[in-house]
Amino acid sequence: DCAKEGEVCSWGKKCCDLDNFYCPMEFIPHCKKYKPYVPVTTNCAKEGEVCGWGSKCCHGLDCPLAFIPYCEKYRGRND
């Protein structure tokens, strides 16, 4: 059993299309579509773009600890 776009993932349920979707680290995560990787020109990576590897996330976004991390919105923090 696997989760499609917008369906709840984790809890032992992975996204069906792992090449194009990821399961964000959230309390109740839903499968999200990767945004295609584009070189960061603004010196920061936007939501869904690859971070780490020398590129930091733009303000208000977090770079999760993952093999290929993608910027995601901060949770539980307001800054």
Curated annotation (Swiss-Prot):
Keyword Lipid biosynthesis included in the entry's annotation: no
* Taxonomy, superkingdom: Eukaryota
Report whether Ribonucleoprotein shows up as a keyword of the record: no
Residues the UniProt record annotates as site (Important residue for activation of TRPV1)? M25, L65
For molecular function, the Gene Ontology terms on record are: ion channel regulator activity; lipid binding; toxin activity
Q: Where are the Domain repeats?
A: 2-31, 42-71
| Disulfide bond sites | C2-C16, C9-C23, C15-C31, C44-C58, C51-C63, C57-C71
User: Which GO CC annotations does the UniProt entry carry?
Assistant: extracellular region
Location in or out of the cell: Secreted
Q: Give the main localization category.
A: secreted
Tissues where the protein occurs = Expressed by the venom gland.
Q: Which UniProt keywords apply?
A: Disulfide bond, Ion channel impairing toxin, Knottin, Lipid-binding, Repeat, Secreted, Toxin
Site (Interacts with TRPV1 (reaches into the void formed by S4, S6 and pore-helix)) location in chain = W11, F27, W53, F67
Stretch list, region 2 X approximate repeats with cysteine pattern C-C-CC-C-C: 2-71
The record's function comment reads:
Selectively activates the heat-activated TRPV1 channel. It binds to TRPV1 in an open state-dependent manner, trapping it there to produce irreversible currents. It binds to the outer edge of the external pore of TRPV1 in a counterclockwise configuration, using a limited protein-protein interface and inserting hydrophobic residues into the bilayer. It also partitions naturally into membranes, with the two lobes exhibiting opposing energetics for membrane partitioning (K1) and channel activation (K2).
Domain topic, free-text comment: The presence of 'disulfide through disulfide knots' structurally defines this protein as a knottin. This toxin contains 2 'disulfide through disulfide knots' that are separated by a short linker. Bivalence accounts for irreversible toxin action.
Provide the family line: Belongs to the neurotoxin 23 family. Double-knot toxin subfamily.
Q: How does it assemble?
A: Interacts with TRPV1 (2 toxins (4 moieties) bind 1 channel (homotetramer)).
Q: What is this protein called?
A: Tau-theraphotoxin-Hs1a
Report the source organism.
Cyriopagopus schmidti
